[in-house]
Amino acid sequence: MGYWNSKVVPKFKKLFEKNSAKKAAAAEATKTFDESKETINKEIEEKKTELQPKVVETYEATSAEVKALVRDPKVAGLKKNSAAVQKYLEELVKIEFPGSKAVSEASSSFGAGYVAGPVTFIFEKVSVFLPEEVKTKEIPVEEVKAEEPAKTEEPAKTEGTSGEKEEIVEETKKGETPETAVVEEKKPEVEEKKEEATPAPAVVETPVKEPETTTTAPVAEPPKP
């Protein structure tokens, strides 16, 4: 217990005092910055054409986390990505973005989370120069799961139809075999009918002509006187 009071408690007190001092200093820096917002807005409007390409270039070169924070700044995100935010603020200082220098210095001293107000203000002004973000429609997971069974049922239907087609083809094939057999069986009958219709040529006996005897008619005698 004596060690706790003599060693640990004093450290906590110093830490709390340090944090409270940091918060107080950060609050003072935020207040000073808020007073200069009107001037910053005027400078941004005057340099709008000049800043446009530079802002887009610095934005494209930064990380995905910072890009998300620029478009939608949140205190939790600023604290979590404090180092990346600080780096981006320094890039804005290089292109002389109005108000970025004061915010970069405050963020470097106290952390982006402690001066979230000024950082958010600068990010909102930066986002004005950025092209509109194309948002893709996100399909809920439940809808995707609901669609999956429907998709799997379709092949089953095609399989069923293909199976039916196969059965029909098989039946037709089976049905064709008797017809072919009948045709084959009928062929001999047709041939028989043809044979009956066309009888074999009968042998014609040519009668032997007997030698003709030439009988001379009797000569009429002249009448007697």
From Swiss-Prot:
What residues bear Phosphoserine in this entry?
107
Record text on subunit structure and interactions: Interacts with Turnip mosaic virus (TuMV) P3N-PIPO.
Q: What does this protein do?
A: May be involved in intracellular signaling through interaction with PtdInsPs and calmodulin (CaM); may keep PtdInsPs attached to the plasma membrane until Ca(2+)-CaM reaches a competitive concentration subsequent to an increase triggered by a stimulus, thus leading to PtdInsPs release and subsequent activation of InsPs-dependent signaling cascade. Interacts competitively at the N-terminus with calcium ions and CaM (in a calcium-dependent manner), and with the phosphatidylinositol phosphates PtdIns(3,4,5)P(3), PtdIns(3,4)P(2), PtdIns(4,5)P(2) and PtdIns(3,5)P(2).
> Where this protein primarily resides, as one coarse class?
membrane
Keyword Coiled coil assigned: no
Phenotype on disruption: Long etiolated hypocotyls. Reduced accumulation and cell-to-cell movement of Turnip mosaic virus (TuMV) leading to an enhanced plant resistance.
Q: Where is the lipid attached (N-myristoyl glycine)?
A: 2
Locate the Phosphothreonine modifications and list their residues. Answer: 32, 152, 177
Can you name the source organism? Arabidopsis thaliana (Mouse-ear cress)
Q: Where is the composition biased (Basic and acidic residues)?
A: 140-197
Q: How is the cofactor bound?
A: Binds 6 Cu(2+) ions per subunit. Decreased of the heat stability in the presence of metal ions (e.g. K(+), Ca(2+), Cu(2+), Sr(2+) and Mg(2+)).
Q: Which GO terms describe its biological process?
A: cellular response to copper ion; cellular response to iron ion; cellular response to magnesium ion; cellular response to magnesium starvation; cellular response to mannitol stimulus; cellular response to molecule of bacterial origin; cellular response to potassium ion; cellular response to salt stress
Q: Name one GO cellular component term.
A: cytoplasmic microtubule
What is the induction note for this entry? Accumulates in response to CuCl(2), mannitol, sorbitol, and flagellin oligopeptide (e.g. flg22) treatments. Induced after long treatment (2 days) with NaCl, KCl, MgCl(2) and FeCl(3). Slight induction in Mg(2+) deprivation. Slightly repressed by dehydration.
Q: Which UniProt keywords apply?
A: Calcium, Calmodulin-binding, Cell junction, Cell membrane, Copper, Cytoplasm, Cytoskeleton, Host-virus interaction, Lipid-binding, Lipoprotein, Membrane, Microtubule, Myristate, Phosphoprotein
Region labeled Disordered — which residues? 140-225
- UniProt xrefs under InterPro entries: DREPP
Give the protein's recorded name.
Answer: Plasma membrane-associated cation-binding protein 1
Cofactor dependence: Cu(2+)
Which tissues does the record link to its expression? Mostly expressed in the basal region of hypocotyls. Expressed in seedlings, roots, shoots, stems, leaves (e.g. in epidermis and vascular tissues), flowers (e.g. in pistils and anthers) and siliques (at protein level).
Origin, by domain of life?
Eukaryota
The entry sums up its family as follows:
Belongs to the DREPP family.
